[in-house]
Amino acid sequence: MANVVVVGAQWGDEGKGKIVDWLSIEADIVVRFQGGHNAGHTLVIGNQVYKLALLPSGIVRLGKLSVIGNGVVVDPQHLVEEIAKLAAQGIEITPDNLKIAENVPLILGLHRELDAHRESSTVEGVKIGTTKRGIGPAYEDKVGRRAIRLMDLAEPDTLDEKIVRLLAHHEPLRRGLGLEPISAGAIRAELESLAPKILPFMDATWDLLENARRAGKRILFEGAQGALLDIDHGTYPFVTSSNTVAANAATGSGLGPKAIGYVLGIAKAYTTRVGGGPFPTELLDETGQLIGDRGHEYGVNTGRRRRCGWFDAVLVRQTVKTCGIDGIALTKLDILDGFKEIKVCVGYDLDGRRIDRLPASQSAQARVKPIYETIDGWEGTTAGARSWADLPAQAIKYVRRIEELIEAPVALLSTSPERADTILVHDPFRD
């Protein structure tokens, strides 16, 4: 059996939570390997709705081990709050079903403050459209080798020197930005108050996962955001601060590349994006408004309305290649029910020349214009379909055309937020 990596094939918000929950029934372990609590997702199980941001989706399933890998940045305050919120919904979270890598960097109050300050800036190019949760600044400190990591809370005698090293960078930065000074004592007090609540979950997760892999356990790697937000392969600088492509499932969990088996990309049947940055197929008319209203396109964490547009086969084909995607889970097909015509982007016009990929240049990305292929819509409904026989013939044609354009098969088809409303074409764990 293959281990499975789930990644977003667009700009995030593709419906990964439902698909991961659906796959977690077969998994023994579910691992988050990058990002932080900036990637909210909603799970609908029976009559219960769970809203997660940091914890792996497997946490709501009995008998599953959830792991937060070293590639994640953890806000300890948010972690405690999310655990408490789930506990109020009847989900018990203990060190038996949740493990956190000992070397995860921590998000502190100063990171959140810095992030929010940057996003409120009126200087051109400074505002990216982040969730203001401190993710980027925390990754900056990780790369700058000054981060406070979870294991540091277990060694209070060495904590002061690490805080001093952290502030050696942040104090002059804060002065330059006009922010109030922050004391080492305040940071230490913040960490000491949270340490007893989160240290019990600490483990050498790389070792735990490797032993599980060798024992034949099925591991599901849960990506956050989407491949087009990857710090290297995304629409830079309008990206997140981590690698969101599938290869980072290994690095971000402490395993070797052979641990990755089947790569499942998640894509909506249309396209959405939150925040700034290029969006070639964006619809600024009533059609875009209609798609957003039907799809309830609002961020789980922020409540921000998502930008909406037609399916961009060029971008998804690009992420199929950068992520090594074996199959696609196509979600929200039902949102397109009733459209007389549906457009799919099959190429770009850049200064009068046709191209078949998104250029890396920021200025070129802003100039590309979509080249559309128009496909007949369907009158019947796809909502709640659980087999191909339940789908209108034209809806099937739409799916098949997408497969051709992105050069990857559709392995799963989601037709509503309910986990049972899923058409399985190929089981990723059986690869």
UniProtKB/Swiss-Prot annotation:
GO biological processes: 'de novo' AMP biosynthetic process; IMP metabolic process
Enzyme class, first EC level, given as a word: ligase
One Pfam family matching this protein: Adenylsucc_synt
Catalyzed reactions: IMP + L-aspartate + GTP = N(6)-(1,2-dicarboxyethyl)-AMP + GDP + phosphate + 2 H(+)
Residues annotated to bind GTP: 12-18, 40-42, 306, 332-334, 414-416
Swiss-Prot/TrEMBL cofactor(s): Mg(2+)
Pathway(s): Purine metabolism; AMP biosynthesis via de novo pathway; AMP from IMP: step 1/2
Compartments where located: Cytoplasm
UniProt GO molecular function: adenylosuccinate synthase activity; GTP binding; magnesium ion binding
Keyword Cytoplasm part of the UniProt annotation: yes
Transmembrane segments: none
InterPro entries for this protein: Adenylosuccin_syn_GTP-bd, Adenylosuccin_syn_Lys_AS, Adenylosuccinate_synth_dom1, Adenylosuccinate_synth_dom2, Adenylosuccinate_synth_dom3, Adenylosuccinate_synthetase, P-loop_NTPase
Predominant subcellular localization, coarse grouping: cytoplasm
Protein name stated in the entry: Adenylosuccinate synthetase
Organism per entry: Beijerinckia indica subsp. indica (strain ATCC 9039 / DSM 1715 / NCIMB 8712)
Upper lineage: Bacteria, Pseudomonadati, Pseudomonadota, Alphaproteobacteria, Hyphomicrobiales
